[in-house]
Regions:
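Surface-exposed or flexible loop/turn and strand-edge residues in extracellular/cell-surface modules
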Residues: 15, 26, 88, 101-103, ...
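Solvent-exposed strand-loop boundary residues in beta-sheet-rich modules
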Residues: 60, 97-99, 166-168, 198-200
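A short beta-strand micro-motif common to beta-rich folds, especially ectodomain repeats
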Residues: 85-97, 187-198, 205
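Short, surface-exposed loop/turn segments at beta-strand-coil junctions that are enriched for proline
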Residues: 79-85, 181-186
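Surface-exposed loop/turn motifs at beta-strand-loop junctions within extracellular Ig-like
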Residues: 35, 80, 95-97, 143, ...
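Surface-exposed binding patches on compact interaction domains or structured appendages
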Residues: 13, 36-75, 138-140, 144-177
């Protein structure tokens, strides 16, 4: 009788899921792809390597491969994820002769969204006449959105409140005005502290009124 020749195929990956950081990175996937020749059901010769192909899906994922002694090493690249949701994909490895497949899930974390707050005043000192008067000052209160640590868009304005302290000084009709009452005594001082409603940033205007 003629000998019956068959092959036992094996295909495996060293990971079922690969996770990537939002900034993007490269990770390795090791594939073992082999066949064992059998004659009349018994192993004949050594284990042989079998080629594989890869199909990758998902936004921002790509791959390159290099040969190993018993399969292939796939280098999987995830580009930066700037979305505020996780980025998902997959890579399917197919063994060329047997059509066996192994599927590996690719997950990438959502972008890290933070805000940087600023609060400045101009000028930082105000001087008032002894007779009393109202003065205004400039306030810049903003927030800058950052995605993965880099600026996204332009700064936007945030609201703020002002607290005035010191004898004879009160807040005026707006959050950026100070009223000094008439001073009949020695020189006096106070402060106007501006605080952003988001981010809790502060800036201080020093107030002085002449004797």
């Amino acid at each position: 009788n003629a000998a019956i020749v068959t092959y036992d195929y094996a295909l495996s990956a060293n990971s079922q899921t690969i996770q990537f950081v939002a900034l993007g990175e490269t990770k390795s996937l090791q594939i073992v792809s082999t066949r064992q020749k059998k004659v009349n059901g018994k192993p004949s010769g050594g284990v042989e390597k079998v080629d594989t192909t890869a199909q990758i899906t998902g936004t921002g994922f790509s791959q390159t491969s290099s040969e190993t002694s018993n399969g292939e090493n796939y280098s999987i690249v995830a580009a930066e994820n700037k979305a505020e949701t996780d980025n998902n994909g997959s890579i399917t490895i197919t063994q060329t002769e047997s059509n066996k497949t192994v599927n590996v899930t690719l997950t990438q974390l959502a972008a890290a969204v933070t805000y940087e707050y600023t609060c400045t005043v101009d000028p930082t000192t105000l001087s008032f006449a002894a007779a009393g008067e109202t003065k205004i000052f400039g306030v810049t209160a903003t927030k800058q959105k950052k995605v993965n640590g880099s600026n996204s868009g332009i700064p936007s304005a945030v609201t703020y409140t002002t607290t005035v302290q010191g004898e004879g000084f009160t807040k005026g009709s707006s959050e950026y005005s100070v009223v000094a009452a008439a001073n009949t005594g020695a020189q006096r001082t106070g402060t106007a502290v501006v605080t952003t409603t988001e981010g809790n940033k502060t800036a201080t205007v020093t107030l002085t009124q002449l004797a």
